[in-house]
């Protein structure tokens, strides 16, 4: 698996996307210099000097994922898929001191979303029945559905919805490699304006709420998912929980996190990259939003660190 491929130009994005930007005019060198200037102007921060942050920015600029994050401040379908399907040990241990290795192998939120992806797949596999219709919104590469086992599930139909045409093209390619082309239909559409009224048995959604700070908008998103499901249908979604520094209600299990990796994560995503996914919600907030959208039988499956819970909810019969 290549971890450094895909030029920035080949990952052009679409207007209206909230997870990653669309500006490709600035050269990599100019972008890095702009980041350097911002870091110098901000000065030292607790636990890190300007010089240390400049060196981390340079390290980010040396590999594909880092360059994408510096430019877009979020993840697209390709890099999300790379992170969640990465097999630990793919990067050799001789690279252990590199930032790329640390990001793929050590950062707590990366480990949490990879664990979350595994939870999604196991839950979705259990929910699949012959003849069912399942949707992924936004679908990205649609790995949580396309990587399932359909050998004993005749008649299952799969729907992918995304605003990003690159994501849809990549999902189509993955469906072909999995021998699922005939089962899959792909639609370029806004998640808040789904045209799937009461036609889906299972709907999977990861990532969109992380980029939406407006709680009302997230509730509206859950309403759209509710309306897309048939009565009795199931939503499988997720959310990021707040760190202890931001909320006394933080559920994080600090015993399951590496303190050094956690400090590096905060420095990278908050200070250097200024990541757009810094929208956190508690289990209680998520329960309230889903209930307002009409869902019942809400239950949570936490990752070990309790950073990226999976939540499963039903549309009433």
Predicted region positions:
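A short SAM/SAH-binding and catalytic strip from SAM-dependent methyltransferases
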Residues: 201-216
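Conserved SAM-binding loop of SAM-dependent methyltransferases across substrates and taxa
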Residues: 140-155
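Conserved SAM-binding loop
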Residues: 171-172
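C-terminal alpha-helical "lid/dimerization" subdomain adjacent to the S-adenosyl-L-methionine
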Residues: 236-293, 298-300
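Class I SAM-dependent methyltransferase Rossmann-like catalytic core
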Residues: 60-128
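Conserved SAM/SAH-binding beta-strand->alpha-helix loop
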Residues: 164-166
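A short acidic, Gly/Pro-enriched loop at the edge of an enzyme's catalytic core
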Residues: 192-203
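A short glycine-rich, Lys/Arg-flanked "PGG" loop and its adjoining helix->strand segment in the class I
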Residues: 218-231
